[in-house]
């Protein structure tokens, strides 16, 4: 089932799934909104991380990037029509974290209140001409014949309860993620790269520098 990163971890904690996926910047500050949002949801000794992928987040724009967008700050242009992700998604969290770092809130971005639930949905809005830009991943942009302006790299982690590590399903998942064939498949997705520690199990404190 698809849902955003924050909602996915909540689903895991409520017993509605066995494994959840979430993404976070490579080096978020311990005081960042990203860290303060994820930290209460993950408990040392209870949750374990599984290496999955490294990917890029950036701006999805019309072919040729007619507005010349190149940086986060370009989202503050008064005439820019932006389409946002819904609250509870990791991509929305990235945007809100950037705004907080600038001392701004969503009112600074025209279209901040216009929301869609997935990368594909915001890409479709840009492709249809209803929006000038959206924050998202390159694979969704390319699937809709859009250009992509990379802004940052991030880790995409899987997380499960420690008690689930010995279940057949999770053991099989770890085996797949550790296989060379999986890494080759992942590398075919635009904007994705295999995680050096893919398929390996990690503790929160040793792996997340902002913990």
Tell what function each PLM region has.
Residues 1-3, 106-119:
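Short beta-strand-to-loop elements that line the ligand-binding cleft
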Residues 64-70, 104, 163-169:
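Short helix-loop capping/hinge motifs at secondary-structure junctions, enriched
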Residues 21-38, 123-152:
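A ligand-binding cleft/hinge motif common to bilobed small-molecule-binding domains
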Residues 1-16, 41-47, 70-73, 100, ...:
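N-terminal hydrophobic or amphipathic helices and topogenic motifs
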Residues 6-20, 25, 115-130:
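Short helices/loops that flank or line small-molecule/ion binding pockets
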Residues 52, 61-82:
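Flexible hinge/capping segments at coil-to-helix
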Residues 73-93, 97:
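Short loop->beta-strand "edge-of-pocket" segments that line small-molecule binding or catalytic clefts
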Residues 43-56, 146-175, 196-202:
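Periplasmic-binding protein-like
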């Amino acid at each position: 089932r698809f849902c955003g990163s924050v909602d996915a971890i909540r689903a895991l904690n409520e017993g509605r799934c066995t494994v959840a996926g979430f993404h976070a910047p490579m080096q978020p500050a311990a005081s960042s909104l990203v860290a303060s949002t994820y930290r209460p949801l993950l408990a040392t000794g209870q949750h374990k991380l599984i290496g999955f992928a490294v990917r890029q987040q950036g701006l999805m724009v019309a072919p040729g990037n007619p507005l010349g967008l190149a940086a986060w700050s370009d989202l503050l242009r008064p005439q820019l029509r932006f389409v946002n992700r819904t609250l509870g998604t990791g991509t929305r969290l990235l945007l809100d974290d950037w705004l907080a770092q600038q001392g701004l809130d969503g009112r600074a971005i025209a279209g901040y209140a216009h929301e869609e639930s997935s990368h594909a949905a915001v890409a479709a809005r840009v492709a249809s001409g209803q929006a000038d830009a959206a924050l998202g991943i390159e694979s969704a942009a390319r699937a809709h014949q859009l250009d992509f302006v990379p802004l940052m790299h991030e880790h995409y982690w899987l997380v499960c309860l420690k008690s689930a590590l010995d279940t057949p399903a999770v053991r099989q998942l770890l085996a797949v993620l550790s296989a060379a064939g999986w890494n080759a498949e992942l590398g075919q997705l635009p904007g994705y790269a295999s995680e050096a520690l893919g398929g390996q199990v990690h503790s929160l404190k040793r792996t997340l520098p902002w913990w």
